Structures are given as structure tokens and as C-alpha cells.
Swiss-Prot record:
The species this protein was found in: Lactiplantibacillus plantarum (strain ATCC BAA-793 / NCIMB 8826 / WCFS1) (Lactobacillus plantarum)
Keyword annotations: Cytoplasm, Ribosome biogenesis
Gene: rimP
Gene Ontology cellular component annotations, sorted alphabetically: cytosol
Any matching Pfam family: RimP_N
Organism lineage: Bacteria, Bacillati, Bacillota, Bacilli, Lactobacillales
Record protein name field: Ribosome maturation factor RimP
Keyword Ribonucleoprotein on entry: no
CDD domains linked: YlxS_C
Amino acid sequence: MSSNVVETIQPVAAAIVSAHQFELVDLEFVREGQSWYLRLYIDKPGGINIEECAMVSDELSEKLDAMEPDPIPQAYFLEVSSPGAERPLKKEADFQNAIGKYVHVGLYQKLDGKKIFEGDLTAVTPTTLTIDYLDKTRHKTVTINREQISQARLAVKF
């Protein structure tokens, strides 16, 4: 059900966001406990502010309320926010822009005994990512097939 909601709402949300020259980073419809959440993550060069998030929220809420049939028949919370410092990497442009940055990559199955890699993204191809990471005190490099990746995002290095 949540994928159908996202497929229905994505073009509406994308039109509103792009009309303001913002980027729709991600859109998700998820259940947490007893509540449903429609979450949009938007951004622009230099960062997005709270007023811009509120403006997109108001416009999207108005459009969704006017849609027939209702794309989300149950009660839900609409949240519009910045992707934050740990921005998800989903589109090809996201990966290209992340080259040289510190990333967190989770895998479906272990590779070299690990399911999570955090390190500097050094190369991106249409099928792979290459990450330089620290294993205890040794620098290592791993190349990961994209099909193995469950999720990827920028990460904050401590």
C-alpha cells in the first residue's frame, strides 16, 4: 500500500517542489506504531529553511485534500523537512555529488564480513561504489555492487 501512495503522490509533490526551484530528495509513506506518516525531504543549494518547508507543506496539503479519489484514505501526518546532514543517497546525481564525502552504506548481505561500511566515497560507476574505510587502524578499500546496497546516506564523521 505505501508504494502505491508514494507512486500516486510523487508527481504532485515533485511539481510543487520544482515550482519553487527546490529538489525533492525523498518521499516516503511509513507506519510507525499506530500512525502513518507522509514525509517529504526537500533541499536547495545553500539549504532549505523552516518557512520554505511550511510553504511546501501547506501547498501539498491543499492539493492532496482536493484529489479524488483520496490517495490516502486513512489518517496520516504530513512532514516536510530538510534531508539533514545525513542525507539519503538514492539518485545517480546524489552518488556523484557525494564523491569525496564520508558515507554510510548498509548491505543486504555481508561483504568481507561486514554489512555496514562507513568511509570516504572515492568512485562511482553505474554498477558500483568504491569506499575507502578504516578497519581498526588499517585503511582499506572496498568496491560494492549497487544491487547489494540496502541503503546509503551521507554520514557525520566523529
